C-alpha cells in the first residue's frame, strides 16, 4: 500500500510563452509519518527519438511531511533552447512530473505539450530559423497519464519478510510410509467390496439358470405346477377314450353272439 497518494494537480500559467516558468499546484495525502523528504522532479522531453535531449528542469524536496492532506506549488524553469534539436522546437512533446521517496520513484504524471507559433502567418509560413520569442506552449492538462509504482516504505522495510519456521526433525520417509500404508488399506477394502459384488452376481446368475431349466415355481424341484395340472387333465381325457373303446367292443361281441345263435337255429 502506498503511504503517499497523489490527489490532484492543477497546471497554472497555461497556455504561456515558451520561455515562461512551469507552475503546478500539487495536492497529496500522507497516511503515516515519513523519515525522509519527498523529491518532486519535472523533466522536459527534448526529442521523440532519443533520451539524450531530455532535460531535468527542476527538482524540489518537500519535508518533513505531516500526516494528512498537503498542498504546495511547484515552479520549474523552462528548457534550454540550445539543447533541443531545431526540428523538435515547434512540435508536440512531453513533460514528466515525478515524485520519489528515498530515491525510489512511486508516481509519474505525463502531459502532452503543443509548441506552436502565436500567429497564423508564422504557422502557415514558418521561418527557416525558429523564432522562440513567438512560440507558445499549451499543456494538455485535461489528459494526464498517471503511472504508479510499488516501493518499500519505512514501515515495510522494518518489518522484513516473514517465512514459515524450519522443521529439521521432520522425517519425510516416515510420512511417505504412512501415506503408502493408507493407500494399501484402501486398495484392500476396494478388493473385498469387489469380491462381494462378484459373489452376489454369481448367485443371481445361478437363479437365472435354474429358472431357465424349468423350475418356474421356485421350489427347487425342477418341475412346474402348471405342467403337472396339464398332465392330470390329459390323463382324464385318455381314460374316457379308453372307456368308450371298451364299450364299443362289448357291443360288437354281443352282436356277434346273437348272430351265431341265429345261425344255429
Curated annotation (Swiss-Prot):
Instruction: Write out the annotated subcellular location.
Output: Nucleus
What domain of life does the native source organism fall in?
A: Eukaryota
Q: What's its job? A: Histone chaperone that facilitates histone deposition and histone exchange and removal during nucleosome assembly and disassembly.
Q: How does it assemble?
A: Interacts with histone H3 and histone H4.
* DNA repair keyword on record: no
Q: Which GO terms describe its cellular component?
A: chromatin; chromosome, telomeric region; cytosol; H3 histone acetyltransferase complex; nucleus
Region of interest (Disordered), ranges = 155-265
Q: What is the official name of this protein in its record?
A: Histone chaperone ASF1
The UniProt similarity line reads: Belongs to the ASF1 family.
Amino acid at each position: 500500500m502506498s503511504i503517499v497518494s497523489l490527489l490532484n494537480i492543477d497546471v497554472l500559467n497555461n497556455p504561456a510563452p515558451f520561455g515562461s516558468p512551469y507552475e503546478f499546484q500539487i495536492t497529496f495525502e500522507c497516511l503515516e509519518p515519513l523519515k525522509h523528504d519527498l523529491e518532486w522532479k519535472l523533466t522536459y522531453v527534448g526529442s521523440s527519438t532519443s533520451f539524450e535531449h531530455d532535460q531535468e528542469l527542476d527538482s524540489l524536496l518537500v519535508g518533513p511531511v505531516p500526516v494528512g492532506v498537503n498542498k504546495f506549488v511547484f515552479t520549474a524553469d523552462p528548457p534550454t533552447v540550445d539543447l533541443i534539436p531545431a526540428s523538435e522546437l515547434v512540435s508536440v512533446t512531453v513533460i514528466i512530473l515525478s515524485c520519489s521517496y528515498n530515491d525510489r520513484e512511486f508516481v509519474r504524471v505525463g502531459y502532452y505539450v503543443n509548441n506552436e507559433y502565436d500567429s497564423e502567418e508564422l504557422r502557415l509560413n514558418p521561418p527557416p530559423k525558429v523564432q522562440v520569442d513567438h512560440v507558445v506552449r499549451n499543456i494538455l492538462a485535461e489528459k494526464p497519464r498517471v503511472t504508479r509504482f510499488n516501493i518499500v516504505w519505512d514501515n515495510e522495510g522494518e518489518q522484513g519478510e516473514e517465512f514459515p519456521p524450519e522443521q529439521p526433525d521432520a522425517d519425510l520417509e516416515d510420512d511417505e510410509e504412512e501415506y503408502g500404508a493408507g493407500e494399501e488399506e484402501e486398495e484392500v477394502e476396494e478388493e473385498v467390496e469387489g469380491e462381494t459384488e462378484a459373489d452376489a452376481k454369481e448367485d443371481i446368475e445361478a437363479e437365472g439358470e435354474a429358472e431357465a431349466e424349468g423350475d418356474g415355481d421356485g421350489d427347487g424341484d425342477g418341475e412346474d405346477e402348471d405342467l403337472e395340472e396339464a398332465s392330470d387333465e390329459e390323463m382324464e381325457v385318455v381314460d374316457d377314450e379308453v372307456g368308450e373303446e371298451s364299450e364299443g367292443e362289448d357291443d360288437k361281441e354281443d352282436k356277434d353272439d346273437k348272430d351265431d345263435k341265429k345261425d344255429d337255429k
